[in-house]
C-alpha cells in the first residue's frame, strides 16, 4: 500500500483483516515475513484503549498523545481542538471513569483524528455517538484523507461506506488476498461470495 492510497479491506469474520491491522499497529508481530510501516499511524480501532480511568479527560489526551509518539508541546497545540471536536468541554477535567461509554469513544476518536496522522486505520469506528456526531466523524475522516499524503486503510462490511472513502479494495479469505483491485470490482467479488452462501 503506497502513501496517499485509500484502501478498503473486505472479508468475512476470520479472514485475517483484524490480524493485519494488529500487525500494522504493532499490537502483534508476524510469525514469518515482515511488515514495514512508514509514517505516524492513527488507528480508530478500540477507541478507549489506553485511557487511565483515574485520569481526567485532559490528562488522558496527554497520555494517549504520548503513546502515539507526540511531544507535550505538540499535544498542547492540539488539546483544545481535541476537546472541541469531542464535545465534552464541561467534563474534560473529570476522571474518565465518570464518562459514559459514548463520551469515552468520542474522546478517543477525537484524539486519533486530530494528531495529524500519515496513516489512518479505521475498523468500523465511524459509528461513534448520535447521527450528528457520526456525520461529523465522516466529514473529519474525509478531510484527513483528502490531504494527498495520508494513507487510509478501512475495514468495513458496509460496501457503500467503503465506496465513499476508498479507491482500491482488497478482498481476503482465510488469511490470503483473493482479489486486489479498484473498489467497484472488489466489491462485486466480495458481494458475489456473499450471494453464493445464501
Question: What residue ranges belong to the model's regions?
Answer:
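H-loop/switch region of ABC-family ATPase nucleotide-binding domains
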Residues: 156-157
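The feature captures the beta-strand-to-loop junction immediately N-terminal to the Walker
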Residues: 10-12
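Conserved ABC ATPase "signature" C-loop
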Residues: 174-175, 190
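A short, surface-exposed alpha-helical micro-motif characterized by mixed small hydrophobic
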Residues: 162-164
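Helical segment within the ABC ATPase nucleotide-binding domain
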Residues: 134-147
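Conserved ABC ATPase "signature" region
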Residues: 62, 74-91
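ABC ATPase "signature
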Residues: 180-181
Amino acid at each position: 500500500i503506497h502513501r496517499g492510497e485509500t484502501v478498503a479491506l473486505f472479508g468475512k469474520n476470520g479472514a485475517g483483516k483484524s490480524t493485519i491491522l494488529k500487525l500494522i499497529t504493532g499490537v502483534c508481530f508476524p510469525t514469518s515475513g515482515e511488515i514495514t510501516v512508514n509514517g505516524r499511524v492513527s488507528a480508530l480501532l478500540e477507541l478507549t484503549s489506553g485511557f487511565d480511568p483515574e485520569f481526567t479527560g485532559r490528562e488522558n489526551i496527554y497520555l494517549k498523545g504520548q503513546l502515539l509518539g507526540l511531544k507535550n508541546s505538540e499535544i498542547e497545540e492540539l488539546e483544545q481542538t481535541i476537546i472541541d471536536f469531542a464535545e465534552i468541554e464541561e467534563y474534560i477535567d473529570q476522571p474518565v471513569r465518570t464518562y459514559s461509554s459514548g463520551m469515552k469513544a468520542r474522546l478517543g476518536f477525537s484524539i486519533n483524528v486530530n494528531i495529524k496522522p500519515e496513516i489512518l486505520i479505521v475498523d468500523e469506528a465511524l459509528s461513534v455517538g448520535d447521527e450528528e456526531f457520526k456525520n461529523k466523524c465522516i466529514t473529519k475522516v474525509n478531510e484527513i484523507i483528502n490531504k494527498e499524503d495520508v494513507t487510509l486503510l478501512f475495514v468495513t462490511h458496509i460496501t457503500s461506506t467503503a465506496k465513499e472513502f476508498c479507491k482500491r479494495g482488497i478482498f481476503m479469505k482465510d488469511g490470503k488476498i483473493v482479489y486486489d483491485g479498484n473498489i467497484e470490482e472488489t466489491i462485486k467479488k466480495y458481494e458475489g461470495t456473499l450471494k453464493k452462501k445464501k
